[in-house]
């Protein structure tokens, strides 16, 4: 190995990438990843609320997306550099050592997107709109994460003599053995290389600025801003990969990440061109008005799924309760109450019908008929033409009973007047002759008795007739009301 200490480099590498606090190691790579995640959630939350979303949504989705993204990134790295772990001299267990570096961005975006999709399904929010809100924050998090590559002295490019070249130092452990990840540099420069981590970091920042400005000017939505993020990052990554010379899987002599970048770039451009233009309305970003549970509260998540259309209206419950036949018809509560009151009044009128009070019965029957007519008007064609005929017959019978009562009253009044005239005529005759008076009294008594019997008989007959008419009227009214009640339940 040839050490080069005479080359002036403007960018030195950190002497180490891990520090120990007692037995606990603090790795710069992990700290950069965590810092990037925190910044992405914080900024993404602000952007989501500015677009009309509810506070806390980005953190909720991140509880799914971040673990999925870390697993996907590591899986992509292991799959594309499998010889490092499963080849000759490799240790398969080290494939799980995520803290030692090695995250493939394409695997992180793909599997992290699946986690975000699951969360958006649970919380009932549109995934494309969510992607647009977090696209610039994600890319900024990637830029921060690239600093971890600097601390680990990894993902650098070919050797160069440019003044911004990066110094690479060999690192050794306490025993003096080479340890690039956990060791400490002795200050001797091994080589000067292209700082590809810095190239990608600066490119990411430029794309972030471009995305923010484009979003402000054109109000991009429906996932098209996220597509621009993917396309912009892929374009820059393609050229950065051309400058790297570290170990990687090759396809036809070309690094596999170059193929991936090209394919993803084309797919992102196609989505941007054919996706819906404009931006979603702010109300579409609302999850439905229920308290968001934490992801590990599975029972609460199931309960939250019921609230997609909001809580049930109180009126709907009341209308279902008023349905007496159990078929849960959507009868409005106010109409059901009015119909119930009318039916009760009609039945009360039938129960209180009395032949001795024909006038009140007739009036009550008219009221019941009017109520039945009003009920039919409220519910439309529920009674039918036969009900109209019954109500007309009831009204006619009530009118006949009233006429009969009036005729009976007139006859009784006439009989009373005749009796008064006869008594007035008999008084002078009594003054002239006692015998004549006695005879006249007997005659008047018989005549009065006859008239009394006749009047009583007339009143009995008329009362009987009126009672019969009232009963018929009440029955007709009851039938009409029963049909109205039946129509109410069928409405």
Curated annotation (Swiss-Prot):
The keyword Chloroplast does not apply. The chain crosses the membrane at residues 24-44, 58-78, 98-118, 192-212, 256-276. Pathway: Protein modification; lipoprotein biosynthesis (diacylglyceryl transfer). Pfam families: LGT (PF01790). It is found in: Cell membrane. Keywords: Cell membrane, Membrane, Transferase, Transmembrane, Transmembrane helix. One of its GO terms (cellular component) is plasma membrane. It is a multi-pass membrane protein. PANTHER family: PHOSPHATIDYLGLYCEROL--PROLIPOPROTEIN DIACYLGLYCERYL TRANSFERASE, PROLIPOPROTEIN DIACYLGLYCERYL TRANSFERASE. Catalyzes the transfer of the diacylglyceryl group from phosphatidylglycerol to the sulfhydryl group of the N-terminal cysteine of a prolipoprotein, the first step in the formation of mature lipoproteins. Belongs to the Lgt family. This is Phosphatidylglycerol--prolipoprotein diacylglyceryl transferase.
